[in-house]
Amino acid sequence: MKVTPLAFESLGVRSQATLVETKDVRILIDPAVSLAPRRYGLPPHQLEVDKLTELAKKIYEISKDVDIIVITHYHYDHHDPGYVIPIEIYSNKMVFIKDPTNNINNSQKYRRAPKFLRALKDIPNKIEVADGKEFIFGSTKLIFSKAVPHGADERLGYVIQLGINDKDGTVLFTSDIEGAPKEQHLDFTKKISPNFIIIDGPLSYLLGRALSEEDLDKSIKNMESIVKNGLQYAIIDHHVLRDLNHENVLKPVKEVAKDFGVKVISAAEYLGVEPNLLEAHRRELFKKENKPARIPRGLAKLLHAGDN
């Protein structure tokens, strides 16, 4: 099994787009890219827009040779109804989606999911609601969790987690569980016993606003418990990498991981490149070059449609 992170915060954009290849199938998870509409009171910098354009093209090219596309929920850094990445990426694919009508918040149920499904009409070979189901392709098994909250409560909706198992082991893609602050986030991890996990981490950059100290502590303790249970790799990247203080936030997890021989890294480090935290450094980018970005029309529509 081969895991390739395609777009993450450590690669310069808001995303968790990932390619997983087994001898049976090529699976593209959450093919979307986005930017923070405002950060530190500032709009996206031109470097962020350029990086988004680059990674969107990369996802588009890779999509041509995949068999399966998975959408874990309907936030714009995890799905794209054609704003930035052409909807044609779904042509002739098998598409597994988060249930668009059950265990879902209102903005996704009544706006985002219906818009996405209308855009997909007649394009994929098949669309399958995946919540709580398993699918077998040769010696590869796709195991989907039931819907779990996007973080400590349901305000941001629900997501589905994905386990991919073959003879080499099991990869777990947690989607946006915000570092697993709830026990039900851990249930799926215990069920599938992954040796490789891709997890988003807590919303620590919003501590005191969208994240309480109590829930941050729960996330850290639960991530510590995850790395104690047979892991080899943990890519922790997405929400937590929007925080300039992410090293201190993740320090307890990394210390436990070291004791258990687990490698905890960002998507960029996994690929062998330097992390490029453009959003977290947006203030510094504008200090170096203080001019607003030229926003392409599709990206403008995406940013206008709401934050992630």
From Swiss-Prot:
<protein>
    <recommendedName>
        <fullName>UPF0282 protein STK_23220</fullName>
    </recommendedName>
</protein>
<dbReference type="InterPro" id="IPR014426">
    <property type="entry name" value="UPF0282_hydrls"/>
</dbReference>
<comment type="similarity">
    <text>Belongs to the UPF0282 family.</text>
</comment>
<dbReference type="InterPro" id="IPR001279">
    <property type="entry name" value="Metallo-B-lactamas"/>
</dbReference>
<dbReference type="InterPro" id="IPR050114">
    <property type="entry name" value="UPF0173_UPF0282_UlaG_hydrolase"/>
</dbReference>
<dbReference type="Pfam" id="PF00753">
    <property type="entry name" value="Lactamase_B"/>
</dbReference>
<dbReference type="InterPro" id="IPR036866">
    <property type="entry name" value="RibonucZ/Hydroxyglut_hydro"/>
</dbReference>
